[in-house]
């Protein structure tokens, strides 16, 4: 976990989310698991940057004989692949147990995103917050809408001068100021 100044640490069970979001299920089934993983990483990178979260996206080793590895995807997102034989669930549980004794718990929230009921009970027992994969998807979509709304261009006045876009009362006050008629 990095030392970013974030308001929360978000742990995401990657395959659980892929299996819960309709658009990722479709990608997985039509284009493959790698494409679905990449899309999830891109989506979470944007979401994490918007929310100011430090996000750890966790994937099981998926039967691959490998040791744990992690890669920094962006400033806000790192991707963790568990060791052979370790599940994302156990990786997340260990992270929650460590966080429970970490001084950062007084400064940051720890949120776990998974729809696994047993996992939910365990992480809440460690003091973490929980959200389902569906809730995460809804929050991601809401964040995307907020960003789009912010980026909408302001309606520009068709008038050549700024004063023409002002209401009549303000225009009158400006005219008086210009003519030194104000008290």
List where the protein language model places each region.
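Nuclease catalytic cores that cleave nucleic-acid phosphodiester bonds
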Residues: 2-9, 16-183
